[in-house]
C-alpha cells in the first residue's frame, strides 16, 4: 500500500438522496454463484483481502450492510489473510483520528465515491466497476443487483468520529488505486 502524498483528494458527499439504494441484499449463496461465474474483474473487486469482499471479516457479511469496523483490531480480524499475503486493507486509530487504507483494483474507469450519511454515523465507499452491463429496469445501478455493476462497503463510524471533517485521498498505478480515509475524533484539536 502507498501513502496519500501525491494523491487526488476526493470529495466526501453528504447529499446522496438515492431511494432504494442497496435495497437488494447480497446473500452468501448469490455471491458465491456470482463470483464462480465471473471473470478476473469480479475476482479483483470482490476477491479475498479486498475491502469489498463479503468474506473480509472472516465470515460472510453483506458489504451493503454497515459494519462497525473500528470496534475490531485489524491485526486480529485480518490475521489469516495477512498470513497468506492476501490482505489489501488496513485500519487503525490514533488519539487524533480513525484511518482506513485500502488498495482498490483498477477495473475500467475507477470512480470511487465516499458518502457520509446526514447524521455522520455511516460512511459508504462505492464505485461502478462494470459500466458495460446495462441495468435491466433501474436507471441507478445501486438499486438492483448492484454487485453486477459496482461495489460498496458501508462502515459504522464510532460515536466520537467527527465525520464532517473527514478526508479521502486516491492515488493510482496500473493495477490498483490506493484509498486512504482519515476521520478525526471529535475532541481532536488537529482537524484536517
Curated annotation (Swiss-Prot):
Database matches in InterPro entries: A-crystallin/Hsp20_dom (IPR002068), HSP20-like_chaperone (IPR008978)
Subcellular location: Cytoplasm
Key words, A-Z: Cytoplasm, Stress response
PROSITE patterns cross-referenced by the UniProt entry: SHSP
Domain sHSP: 80-192
One annotated Gene Ontology cellular component of this protein: cytoplasm
Domain of life: Eukaryota
Pfam families documented for this protein: HSP20
Cross-referenced CDD domains: ACD_ScHsp26_like
Subunit (UniProt): May form oligomeric structures.
Listed name of the protein: 21.7 kDa class VI heat shock protein
UniProt lineage: Eukaryota, Viridiplantae, Streptophyta, Embryophyta, Tracheophyta
Amino acid at each position: 500500500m502507498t501513502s496519500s502524498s501525491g494523491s487526488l483528494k476526493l470529495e466526501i458527499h453528504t447529499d446522496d438522496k438515492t431511494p432504494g439504494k442497496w435495497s437488494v441484499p447480497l446473500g452468501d449463496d448469490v455471491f458465491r454463484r456470482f463470483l464462480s461465474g465471473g471473470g478476473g474483474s469480479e475476482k479483483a473487486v470482490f476477491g479475498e483481502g479486498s475491502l469489498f469482499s463479503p468474506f473480509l471479516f472472516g465470515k460472510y457479511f453483506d458489504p451493503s450492510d454497515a459494519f462497525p469496523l473500528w470496534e475490531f483490531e485489524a491485526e486480529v480480524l485480518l490475521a489469516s489473510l495477512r498470513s497468506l499475503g492476501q490482505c489489501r486493507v488496513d485500519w487503525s486509530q490514533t488519539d487524533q483520528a480513525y484511518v482506513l487504507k485500502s488498495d482498490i483494483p483498477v477495473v475500467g474507469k475507477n470512480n470511487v465515491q465516499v458518502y457520509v450519511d446526514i447524521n455522520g454515523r455511516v460512511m459508504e465507499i462505492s464505485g461502478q466497476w462494470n459500466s458495460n452491463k446495462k441495468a435491466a429496469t433501474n436507471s441507478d445501478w445501486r438499486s438492483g443487483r448492484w454487485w453486477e455493476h459496482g461495489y460498496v462497503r458501508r462502515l459504522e463510524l464510532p460515536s466520537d468520529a467527527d465525520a464532517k471533517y473527514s478526508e479521502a485521498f486516491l492515488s493510482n498505478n496500473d493495477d490498483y488505486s490506493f484509498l486512504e480515509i482519515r476521520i478525526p475524533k471529535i475532541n481532536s484539536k488537529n482537524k484536517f
